[in-house]
Amino acid sequence: MTATPWLPAHVDTVTPLTAHARSLVLDVPGWTGSLPGQHLDIRLTAEDGYRAERSYSIASFGPGERVELAVDEVEGGEVSPYLVEEVRPGDFLEVKGPLGQYFVWREDDPSPVQLIAGGSGIVPLLSIARARAAAGTAQPFRLLYSVRSAPDALYADEIEELRARGIPTEWIHTRLAPPGSPRAAGRVSLTELERLTIPPSERPLIYICGPTAFVEATADAVVAAGHPPLRVRTERFGGAS
């Protein structure tokens, strides 16, 4: 089996998403395209030869040599502070990918889809939502997005636009709810999760992405609500980044 090679990536654009997150659009000669939900590895090499690698979800999808990803800065991390604070258009990075076949959505799957994101876990789910909107398929899609507060949401404007393209969104604000919100701030309860997501009777595929504790608690909750474990796909990230 041929190893996936490292490729040089030219940073084309850098766009702030929140006070601590940015999107990067890369031009990657030799990139083969990606499926909705895949990720890549980024490698940084210091002047003394020290290397650090981290995985990041891909927000874009499909063929071509342009890749969009979003990075949320982790305090004390080796890679994310550089990508959020230092990288500029014209810089070069090393990337490897696309990676992952499990956490992907395929257009020919007729199953309803429930997307559940915590924080920057929205990135691969946005890729899936973009792909579904572009395909114009008829199966039900829903998104539940949990963030600390409205300013912490990545791609908030685009997510709202996706409502008009058949992907309704439920917002969960865990620390501070915006003025006029119908829901007080706090974590989602099992009863609320059952009410806001596609029911088990419709046998949806469920994609959950976010911090490890969020993913584990949410996966346990949807299984407790009656969803078969084999219909639940998870992707998680820890503190180092």
Give residue ranges: language-model regions.
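FNR/FR-type flavoprotein reductase catalytic core
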Residues: 2-3, 76-241
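Ferredoxin-reductase
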Residues: 2-91, 147-149, 173-176
